[in-house]
Amino acid sequence: MTTFLSDSEHPQDVKAPPKSARRRAREFVLQGLYQWRVGGADEASIEAYAPEMEGFAKADREFFVGTLRGVISQQEKLIEQVSTHIDRPFNELSPVEACILMLGSFEMLNHAETPYRVIINEAIELTKAFGGTDGHKYVNGVLDKVAAILRPDEVAARKQAKK
């Protein structure tokens, strides 16, 4: 019998910090975007189904709905933004990485209150949890380039502070 670790269990009995409501919402947004992109689910059915999923009650519902709707409605703009920084056509990316890149780009465009490094870190964590083995490295590199375009002052200030 195979045993799987839950989100709160780790091999050395080291407890991970509890997930924030926004991090949980990002996970559900990613799952919804995957259902939309791969399974052809529509926005309304994703919004109706998500609250039934385990753990959704602890997620930031407002962030979930706004972000899911925003990514879907701005998909062309987000794909265009990401496409200038990738090494292949967008539709050749893994579905998980494509959804995470759209999510990260959406947040950079629409959530100025969230530092770009937080957005990138959240995208990396999502990719580690749901994506391919080294997908997080790719996502990190692409979103760093996106941040330099969408948030040039913030990126420059961070580089200046590191000196």
Curated annotation (Swiss-Prot):
Residues 1-21 are annotated as: Disordered. One of its GO terms (molecular function) is RNA binding. The keyword RNA-binding applies. Keywords: RNA-binding, Transcription, Transcription antitermination, Transcription regulation. Transmembrane segments: none annotated. One of its GO terms (cellular component) is cytosol. InterPro entries: NusB-like_sf, NusB_fam, NusB_RsmB_TIM44. GO terms for biological process: DNA-templated transcription termination; transcription antitermination. The keyword Membrane does not apply. Pfam families: NusB (PF01029). It comes from the Bacteria. NCBIfam families: nusB (TIGR01951). Involved in transcription antitermination. Required for transcription of ribosomal RNA (rRNA) genes. Binds specifically to the boxA antiterminator sequence of the ribosomal RNA (rrn) operons. Belongs to the NusB family. This is Transcription antitermination protein NusB. The lineage of its organism: Bacteria, Pseudomonadati, Pseudomonadota, Betaproteobacteria, Rhodocyclales.
